[in-house]
Amino acid sequence: MLALNLYTGDNNDFYPPNPDDANTDPGYNWCSGNAGIGGPQEFDPDVLLDPTRSLLIGYLGNNAKLFRCPADMRQEKYQGTDPALIGHIVPAARTFSMNQAVGTIDPGFAATYSSHSGVPNLPVTGPWLTGVWQQNLHDDPWRTFGKMSDAGPPSPSDLWVFVDEDARGLNDAAFAMTMVGAQWVDLPGTYHNIGCGFAFADGHSETHRWLYRSEKQKGDITDPNDEADWNWMTAHTSAKVQ
Protein backbone atom coordinates (compact mmCIF):
# COMPACT_ATOMS: atom_id res chain seq x y z
CA MET A 1 0.00 0.00 0.00
CA LEU A 2 2.97 2.34 0.41
CA ALA A 3 3.51 2.22 -3.35
CA LEU A 4 -0.13 3.13 -3.93
CA ASN A 5 0.07 6.01 -1.46
CA LEU A 6 3.15 7.35 -3.22
CA TYR A 7 1.44 7.05 -6.60
CA THR A 8 -1.66 8.94 -5.47
CA GLY A 9 0.55 11.59 -3.88
CA ASP A 10 2.12 12.19 -7.28
CA ASN A 11 -1.18 12.10 -9.17
CA ASN A 12 -3.55 14.53 -7.45
CA ASP A 13 -4.97 11.82 -5.18
CA PHE A 14 -6.18 9.72 -8.14
CA TYR A 15 -5.89 5.96 -7.93
CA PRO A 16 -4.10 4.38 -10.91
CA PRO A 17 -6.04 3.03 -13.90
CA ASN A 18 -7.87 -0.22 -13.13
CA PRO A 19 -9.89 -1.07 -16.25
CA ASP A 20 -11.81 -4.29 -16.75
CA ASP A 21 -9.27 -5.64 -19.23
CA ALA A 22 -5.67 -6.83 -19.38
CA ASN A 23 -4.54 -4.09 -21.76
CA THR A 24 -0.85 -3.42 -22.18
CA ASP A 25 -1.33 0.08 -23.63
CA PRO A 26 1.18 2.51 -22.09
CA GLY A 27 -0.38 4.60 -19.34
CA TYR A 28 -3.69 2.76 -19.03
CA ASN A 29 -3.21 -0.01 -16.46
CA TRP A 30 -1.88 -0.19 -12.93
CA CYS A 31 -0.73 -3.74 -13.73
CA SER A 32 -0.88 -5.02 -17.30
CA GLY A 33 -1.29 -8.50 -18.70
CA ASN A 34 -3.19 -11.75 -18.20
CA ALA A 35 -1.41 -13.78 -15.52
CA GLY A 36 -4.04 -16.47 -14.90
CA ILE A 37 -3.70 -20.16 -15.69
CA GLY A 38 -2.76 -20.44 -19.35
CA GLY A 39 -2.50 -16.67 -19.77
CA PRO A 40 0.25 -15.19 -21.96
CA GLN A 41 1.83 -13.43 -18.97
CA GLU A 42 1.36 -16.22 -16.42
CA PHE A 43 5.12 -16.83 -16.33
CA ASP A 44 6.27 -13.61 -17.98
CA PRO A 45 7.02 -10.76 -15.57
CA ASP A 46 8.48 -8.55 -18.31
CA VAL A 47 5.37 -6.39 -18.68
CA LEU A 48 5.35 -5.82 -14.92
CA LEU A 49 8.79 -4.22 -15.18
CA ASP A 50 7.68 -1.64 -17.75
CA PRO A 51 6.79 1.56 -15.85
CA THR A 52 4.55 2.76 -18.68
CA ARG A 53 2.40 -0.39 -18.59
CA SER A 54 2.50 -1.26 -14.89
CA LEU A 55 2.22 2.10 -13.24
CA LEU A 56 3.13 1.05 -9.71
CA ILE A 57 6.41 -0.71 -10.52
CA GLY A 58 8.51 2.42 -10.05
CA TYR A 59 7.06 2.80 -6.55
CA LEU A 60 7.94 -0.84 -5.80
CA GLY A 61 11.65 -0.34 -6.43
CA ASN A 62 11.27 -2.09 -9.81
CA ASN A 63 10.77 -5.38 -7.97
CA ALA A 64 8.20 -7.40 -9.92
CA LYS A 65 8.27 -10.14 -7.27
CA LEU A 66 6.06 -7.90 -5.13
CA PHE A 67 3.12 -8.57 -7.47
CA ARG A 68 3.11 -12.23 -6.38
CA CYS A 69 2.14 -13.86 -3.10
CA PRO A 70 5.02 -16.13 -1.95
CA ALA A 71 2.44 -18.82 -1.13
CA ASP A 72 1.41 -19.00 -4.82
CA MET A 73 3.35 -22.12 -5.79
CA ARG A 74 2.81 -22.07 -9.57
CA GLN A 75 6.02 -22.67 -11.55
CA GLU A 76 6.68 -23.19 -15.24
CA LYS A 77 9.04 -22.23 -18.05
CA TYR A 78 9.62 -18.53 -18.52
CA GLN A 79 7.42 -17.05 -21.28
CA GLY A 80 9.22 -13.76 -21.88
CA THR A 81 12.08 -12.53 -24.02
CA ASP A 82 14.92 -12.04 -21.52
CA PRO A 83 17.79 -14.22 -22.87
CA ALA A 84 19.01 -14.86 -19.33
CA LEU A 85 15.69 -16.49 -18.36
CA ILE A 86 14.65 -18.34 -21.53
CA GLY A 87 14.44 -22.06 -20.80
CA HIS A 88 14.43 -21.55 -17.03
CA ILE A 89 11.65 -22.49 -14.61
CA VAL A 90 10.22 -19.38 -12.96
CA PRO A 91 7.40 -18.66 -10.49
CA ALA A 92 4.11 -17.19 -11.64
CA ALA A 93 4.36 -13.50 -12.42
CA ARG A 94 1.41 -12.21 -10.43
CA THR A 95 -1.13 -13.14 -7.76
CA PHE A 96 -2.54 -9.78 -6.71
CA SER A 97 -5.53 -7.95 -8.18
CA MET A 98 -7.26 -4.67 -7.38
CA ASN A 99 -10.85 -4.20 -6.28
CA GLN A 100 -12.93 -3.35 -9.38
CA ALA A 101 -14.69 -0.68 -7.31
CA VAL A 102 -11.36 1.14 -6.86
CA GLY A 103 -9.29 2.99 -9.44
CA THR A 104 -9.68 5.11 -12.53
CA ILE A 105 -10.49 4.71 -16.22
CA ASP A 106 -10.00 6.96 -19.22
CA PRO A 107 -12.76 8.62 -21.29
CA GLY A 108 -12.12 6.31 -24.23
CA PHE A 109 -12.65 3.19 -22.16
CA ALA A 110 -15.65 4.72 -20.38
CA ALA A 111 -17.31 5.22 -23.77
CA THR A 112 -16.36 1.96 -25.49
CA TYR A 113 -15.18 -0.60 -22.89
CA SER A 114 -12.71 -1.69 -25.55
CA SER A 115 -10.20 1.07 -26.37
CA HIS A 116 -8.22 3.66 -24.45
CA SER A 117 -7.77 7.39 -24.96
CA GLY A 118 -7.53 10.52 -22.85
CA VAL A 119 -6.40 11.01 -19.27
CA PRO A 120 -7.48 8.23 -16.85
CA ASN A 121 -9.09 10.48 -14.25
CA LEU A 122 -12.63 9.08 -14.17
CA PRO A 123 -13.72 6.75 -11.37
CA VAL A 124 -14.10 3.11 -12.38
CA THR A 125 -17.68 1.95 -12.92
CA GLY A 126 -17.40 -1.29 -10.95
CA PRO A 127 -18.59 -3.30 -13.96
CA TRP A 128 -19.70 -6.43 -12.07
CA LEU A 129 -21.10 -4.91 -8.87
CA THR A 130 -24.75 -5.39 -9.88
CA GLY A 131 -24.12 -8.93 -11.11
CA VAL A 132 -24.69 -7.84 -14.72
CA TRP A 133 -21.58 -6.73 -16.59
CA GLN A 134 -21.35 -2.99 -17.27
CA GLN A 135 -24.69 -2.24 -15.59
CA ASN A 136 -23.22 -0.37 -12.64
CA LEU A 137 -22.02 3.21 -13.09
CA HIS A 138 -19.95 5.37 -10.76
CA ASP A 139 -22.05 5.64 -7.58
CA ASP A 140 -25.10 4.26 -9.42
CA PRO A 141 -26.19 2.24 -7.56
CA TRP A 142 -22.93 1.00 -5.98
CA ARG A 143 -20.10 3.25 -4.88
CA THR A 144 -16.81 3.35 -6.75
CA PHE A 145 -13.68 5.17 -5.67
CA GLY A 146 -11.48 7.14 -8.07
CA LYS A 147 -9.45 8.96 -5.41
CA MET A 148 -8.08 7.94 -2.03
CA SER A 149 -10.19 10.68 -0.46
CA ASP A 150 -13.37 9.15 -1.96
CA ALA A 151 -13.46 6.19 0.43
CA GLY A 152 -16.41 5.93 2.76
CA PRO A 153 -18.55 3.98 3.08
CA PRO A 154 -16.88 1.57 3.36
CA SER A 155 -14.42 3.48 5.51
CA PRO A 156 -10.73 3.39 4.52
CA SER A 157 -10.09 0.77 7.20
CA ASP A 158 -12.88 -1.40 5.76
CA LEU A 159 -12.38 -0.90 2.01
CA TRP A 160 -10.05 -3.49 0.54
CA VAL A 161 -7.91 -2.42 -2.42
CA PHE A 162 -5.67 -5.42 -3.18
CA VAL A 163 -6.36 -9.14 -2.83
CA ASP A 164 -4.66 -12.50 -3.36
CA GLU A 165 -6.63 -13.88 -6.30
CA ASP A 166 -7.05 -17.59 -7.00
CA ALA A 167 -5.17 -18.44 -10.20
CA ARG A 168 -8.28 -20.12 -11.63
CA GLY A 169 -10.03 -16.76 -11.77
CA LEU A 170 -7.00 -14.57 -12.36
CA ASN A 171 -6.88 -12.88 -15.75
CA ASP A 172 -6.62 -9.11 -15.77
CA ALA A 173 -5.60 -7.24 -12.62
CA ALA A 174 -9.12 -6.08 -11.69
CA PHE A 175 -11.01 -8.34 -9.27
CA ALA A 176 -14.69 -8.70 -10.21
CA MET A 177 -17.14 -8.84 -7.32
CA THR A 178 -20.93 -8.78 -7.38
CA MET A 179 -22.81 -7.19 -4.49
CA VAL A 180 -26.03 -9.12 -5.10
CA GLY A 181 -27.06 -12.69 -5.72
CA ALA A 182 -24.47 -14.55 -3.59
CA GLN A 183 -22.10 -15.65 -6.33
CA TRP A 184 -18.39 -15.60 -7.04
CA VAL A 185 -17.35 -13.93 -10.30
CA ASP A 186 -13.61 -13.88 -9.62
CA LEU A 187 -12.20 -16.06 -6.88
CA PRO A 188 -10.36 -14.84 -3.78
CA GLY A 189 -7.36 -16.94 -2.85
CA THR A 190 -6.94 -19.58 -0.18
CA TYR A 191 -3.15 -19.57 -0.13
CA HIS A 192 -2.81 -18.99 3.62
CA ASN A 193 -4.31 -22.05 5.31
CA ILE A 194 -7.66 -21.34 3.60
CA GLY A 195 -7.16 -17.65 4.25
CA CYS A 196 -6.70 -14.71 1.92
CA GLY A 197 -4.49 -11.63 2.03
CA PHE A 198 -6.11 -8.20 1.73
CA ALA A 199 -4.65 -4.67 1.72
CA PHE A 200 -6.99 -1.85 2.74
CA ALA A 201 -7.32 1.80 1.76
CA ASP A 202 -6.02 3.03 5.13
CA GLY A 203 -2.74 1.19 4.53
CA HIS A 204 -3.16 -1.86 6.77
CA SER A 205 -3.07 -5.45 5.55
CA GLU A 206 -4.55 -8.60 7.01
CA THR A 207 -5.10 -12.26 6.29
CA HIS A 208 -8.78 -13.10 6.47
CA ARG A 209 -9.52 -16.73 7.26
CA TRP A 210 -12.49 -18.14 5.36
CA LEU A 211 -15.27 -20.01 7.15
CA TYR A 212 -15.77 -22.22 4.10
CA ARG A 213 -12.80 -24.55 4.40
CA SER A 214 -12.17 -25.26 0.74
CA GLU A 215 -11.31 -23.41 -2.45
CA LYS A 216 -13.93 -21.02 -3.78
CA GLN A 217 -15.84 -22.02 -6.92
CA LYS A 218 -17.21 -19.74 -9.61
CA GLY A 219 -20.96 -19.25 -9.77
CA ASP A 220 -23.83 -19.39 -7.30
CA ILE A 221 -23.02 -19.98 -3.65
CA THR A 222 -24.96 -22.72 -1.85
CA ASP A 223 -22.96 -23.40 1.32
CA PRO A 224 -23.89 -21.14 4.28
CA ASN A 225 -20.26 -20.71 5.35
CA ASP A 226 -19.30 -19.74 1.82
CA GLU A 227 -22.17 -17.24 1.78
CA ALA A 228 -20.91 -15.78 5.06
CA ASP A 229 -17.50 -15.34 3.42
CA TRP A 230 -19.13 -13.63 0.44
CA ASN A 231 -21.09 -11.35 2.79
CA TRP A 232 -17.86 -10.35 4.53
CA MET A 233 -16.19 -9.55 1.24
CA THR A 234 -19.12 -7.56 -0.16
CA ALA A 235 -19.21 -5.45 3.02
CA HIS A 236 -15.58 -4.51 2.34
CA THR A 237 -15.90 -4.03 -1.45
CA SER A 238 -18.45 -1.23 -1.90
CA ALA A 239 -21.70 0.18 -0.50
CA LYS A 240 -24.99 1.18 -2.05
CA VAL A 241 -25.52 4.89 -2.56
CA GLN A 242 -28.36 6.04 -0.34
Predicted regions: what they are:
Residues M1-Q242:
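Short, well-structured segments within or immediately adjacent to enzyme catalytic domains
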